[in-house]
């Protein structure tokens, strides 16, 4: 038979790992659309904003999953850095994948924007958490 499944681990997988996997699939599917079927967007327009959002969200989801797990404390301790690294590595693999998609091509600038989106979202998360901690210590909320 095998090892008994710990229900806590099942909840962790559904709550933290499933969103990461689903978001990665969303990115993969959207980057699999041939360029001819995609509306033309300006270089620094919506297409780059989509990269910022996609990889920023991926980074946040990865940080959340790594930070919540308790089995490997070193991963939780470095969850911010690892979230950024994961998003950038996935961005590189996505650009490579686009080389085989008709009408699409991989761009290093997109990888840089992916990394910037990841850093921007994590910076926002850290600022939000710091503000929340500061206001939690001050009952007046000031």
What are these regions (language model features)?
Residues 1-102, 108-109, 115-142:
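Bulky hydrophobic segments
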């Amino acid at each position: 038979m095998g090892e008994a499944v710990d229900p806590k681990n099942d909840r962790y997988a559904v709550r933290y790992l499933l969103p990461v996997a689903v978001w990665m699939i969303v990115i993969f599917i959207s980057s699999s659309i041939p360029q001819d079927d995609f509306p033309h967007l300006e270089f620094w327009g919506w297409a780059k904003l989509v990269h910022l959002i996609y990889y920023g969200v991926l980074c946040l989801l990865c940080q959340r999953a790594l930070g919540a797990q308790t089995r490997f404390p070193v991963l939780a301790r470095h969850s911010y850095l690892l979230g950024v690294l994961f998003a950038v590595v996935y961005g590189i693999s996505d650009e490579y994948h686009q080389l085989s998609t008709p009408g699409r091509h991989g761009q290093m600038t997109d990888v840089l924007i992916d990394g910037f989106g990841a850093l921007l979202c994590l910076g926002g998360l850290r600022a939000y958490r710091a503000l929340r901690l500061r206001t939690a210590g001050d009952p007046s909320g000031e």
